[in-house]
């Protein structure tokens, strides 16, 4: 009898837990400000700079610029790489620097200008990457051009463009001429608003030299930038994950050089450093036939990077830019060759992005650092198969669900305010062990501005498996108005999701014009229900909404 009673208790407990697990509560207190809603999300980047001025590249850049209330910063590789400008995966070129038969420099800014003109025309700002090494300057130029194919080893791409210059003064003159030309073309005030940076991931095979050779190159580059424009902003070093020994040690060595060591050019102590940059990536894998994300890996890189910068008192207020901040490393590795990347077309990429950005802000608060931006290394790949599974924001001119998260961020401004939830994982829990419990992370990020407020909410889990939709009881406290207009937006399988529409079409390899129009419409951010005007009682509103697994919602209030 006792066993039967115990079994019944266990069954009832599991049943109650199953029901409780889907009943989430989120409480937003608009009177408790926790920090500024710095538009750290309004930063994007990609390997292939020549896609910038192509048809779908221009279209996507226009959409990115339109979704943000502030200028968007764009970072691209290969801005000084030698070549004819023909685009390819993980490759790009501008031919900005060549030499004549006598070794005299020849500068040609035609392609670089074409890239930057595309940004400036849209009100965007370059995070101008000084790299990579022109063939004529490389200390080991052959072989130079690589041909990357998805699925092949990364090691094949690290060729002559990765090496230090054979002449540091010629390199410095190239940098000087580029900045000087930029000022002449765009004006001093415009170029003062840019960020100049040196190289990419110099702690990896992207740099064929030593850490000290990088520091030397940085000194020559920074000196050249400042000679051309004394008010220009210069920084680095864009190392890989600081939580790893290699990236962390490189970052520490570089920061020590900039603050304490002798400058290779001036002979004085230190080097200009207007911002510090490092990269942070997650680590998805296949588990029992499904994708399992690892947000914790990315957040540990961010937390360690913040901690390293904060350990230098001179850099306490120096802006930090996470130069690549993504669920994993290779944007040009599609899901067919890398099945762990199958999260990219659907809503898991969206919910991961929402949940991870909230924790980036929380970690910046924890370490008390100046978190300026986090570059989402995702753009578009011209003339590639539909929904191939690249880490991109759009496919063949059609927006993917993840782009709509950034449209949501574009409606959030002012101050971040306190959010608490019974299923919202603490930021340090996500950092240390990711989202691996039996229950999902049902959380929120909320802001308050003059006459407006917004609450982003998500139903995220690392495991990309089907889950029951959650009922979320949302309590909004201390609303400074008596009546508000409430609008909801949604990203899930039925809303803001071109991928699901494409699959329902039969996954056409060559959609018709009518189908493309339908897909473009499905790629836009969709409202969830009708806008409503509601009365606020005692500064408070309470209502419920349903949020599917891996879904993202946004609630906006206007008064």
Name each model-derived stretch:
Residues 51, 80-83, 135, 199-205, ...:
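Conserved radical SAM core fold
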Residues 21-195, 212-242, 267, 271-272, ...:
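Non-catalytic accessory regions flanking glycosidase/transglycosidase catalytic cores in CAZymes
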Residues 343-347, 389-397:
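Active-site rim elements
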Residues 1-22:
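Bacterial Sec-dependent N-terminal signal peptides
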Residues 194-200, 323:
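Short, conserved phosphate-binding/catalytic loop or strand-edge motifs used
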Residues 144-162, 201-202, 278-286, 333-340:
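A short small-residue
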Residues 211-371, 380, 384, 425-429:
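Noncatalytic carbohydrate-binding groove/subsite architecture in carbohydrate-active enzymes
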């Amino acid at each position: 009898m006792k066993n039967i009673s115990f079994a019944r208790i266990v069954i009832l407990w599991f049943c109650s837990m199953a029901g409780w697990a889907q009943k989430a509560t989120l409480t937003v207190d608009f009177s408790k400000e926790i920090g500024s809603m710095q538009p750290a999300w309004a930063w994007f980047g990609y390997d292939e700079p020549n896609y910038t001025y192509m048809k779908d590249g221009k279209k996507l850049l226009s959409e990115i610029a339109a979704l943000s209330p502030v200028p968007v910063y764009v970072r691209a590789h290969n801005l000084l790489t030698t070549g004819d400008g023909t685009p390819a995966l993980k490759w790009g070129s501008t031919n900005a620097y060549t030499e004549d038969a006598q070794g005299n420099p020849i500068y040609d800014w035609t392609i670089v200008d074409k890239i930057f003109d595309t940004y400036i025309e849209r009100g965007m700002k370059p995070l101008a990457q000084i790299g990579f090494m022109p063939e004529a300057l490389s200390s080991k130029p052959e072989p130079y051009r690589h041909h990357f194919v998805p699925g092949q080893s990364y090691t094949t791409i690290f060729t002559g463009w990765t090496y230090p210059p054979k002449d540091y003064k010629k390199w410095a003159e190239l940098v000087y001429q580029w900045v000087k030309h930029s000022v002449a073309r765009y004006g001093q005030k415009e170029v003062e608003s840019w960020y100049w940076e040196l190289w990419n991931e110099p702690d990896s095979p992207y740099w064929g030299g030593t850490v000290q050779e990088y520091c030397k190159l940085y000194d020559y580059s920074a000196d050249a930038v400042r000679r051309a424009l004394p008010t220009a902003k210069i920084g680095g070093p864009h190392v890989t994950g600081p939580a790893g020994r290699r990236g962390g040690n490189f970052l520490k060595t570089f920061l020590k050089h900039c603050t304490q060591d002798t400058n290779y050019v001036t002979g004085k102590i230190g080097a200009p450093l207007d911002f510090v940059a490092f990269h942070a990536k997650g680590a998805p894998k296949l588990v029992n036939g499904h994708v399992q994300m690892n947000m914790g890996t990315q957040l540990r890189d961010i937390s360690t990077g913040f901690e390293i910068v904060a350990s230098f008192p001179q850099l306490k207020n120096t802006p930090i830019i996470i130069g690549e901040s993504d669920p994993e490393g290779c944007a040009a590795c599609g899901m067919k060759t890398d099945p762990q990347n199958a999260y990219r077309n659907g809503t898991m990429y969206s919910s991961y992005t929402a949940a991870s950005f909230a924790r980036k802000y929380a970690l910046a608060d924890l370490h008390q650092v100046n978190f300026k931006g986090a570059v989402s290394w995702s753009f578009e790949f011209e003339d590639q198969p539909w929904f191939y599974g690249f880490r991109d924001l759009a496919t063949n001119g059609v927006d993917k669900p993840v782009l709509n998260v950034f449209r949501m961020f574009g409606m959030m401004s002012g101050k971040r305010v306190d959010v608490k939830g019974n299923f919202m994982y603490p930021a340090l829990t996500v950092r240390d062990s990711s989202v691996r419990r039996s229950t999902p992370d049902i959380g929120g990020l909320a802001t308050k501005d003059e006459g407006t407020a917004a609450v982003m909410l998500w139903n995220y889990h690392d495991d990309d498996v089907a889950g029951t939709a959650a009922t979320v009881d949302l309590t909004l406290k201390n609303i400074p108005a008596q009546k508000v207009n409430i609008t909801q937006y949604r990203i899930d399988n039925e809303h803001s999701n071109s991928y699901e529409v494409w699959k329902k079409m039969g996954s056409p390899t060559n959609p018709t014009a009518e189908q493309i129009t339908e897909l473009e419409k499905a790629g836009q951010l969709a409202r969830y229900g009708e806008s409503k005007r509601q009365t606020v009682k005692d500064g408070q509103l309470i209502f419920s909404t349903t949020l599917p697994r891996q879904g993202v919602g946004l609630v906006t209030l206007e008064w």
